[in-house]
């Protein structure tokens, strides 16, 4: 039995117990890839790692693993790779690049600088709506894709790169660098301007720099699975 991990949907990062920073990823592409795998293969298990609101497949061969935030995603991905023999890892999830380090205000920052004192931060479970000039100080999140081959060198890794409003040449160059840096076996490159309604143009790039163009999510799923099968 082959085991797949598919990460899907968007990640939210907490500001306080009520508010979050998030993105608009629905998880539709991850679900489409999962459904195509389920239709084309019988002896598989899919670990579908997703956010609470992500679209998801419904099938007894799919194990749903919900995550809250990038650090939770990191813990659950590492646990999967350490405790299961994962044959394929398809990382479609839109992971946040930054998380909140602390929250303060401009006045508190000025006071800290003028007095050469520690920064006064807001630690309320719900920040008051009467606070003025809020400042969110962000810090980088861990890069999940860089963990995969370190934890499981033999796992077949598919990465995804999304840019906005760039040329095809630049898109493919950036995606290729992502592939090489993280030892991906395939990388899917797409531009936000090419994703609308039922259209979803993408370029699938293999380790030999062969580029296969896809026109929508179903086409991406079909061609991606075919390329994965041909290389294993």
Feature map (PLM): residue ranges:
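A cross-family phosphate/adenosyl-ligand binding-site feature
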Residues: 1-232
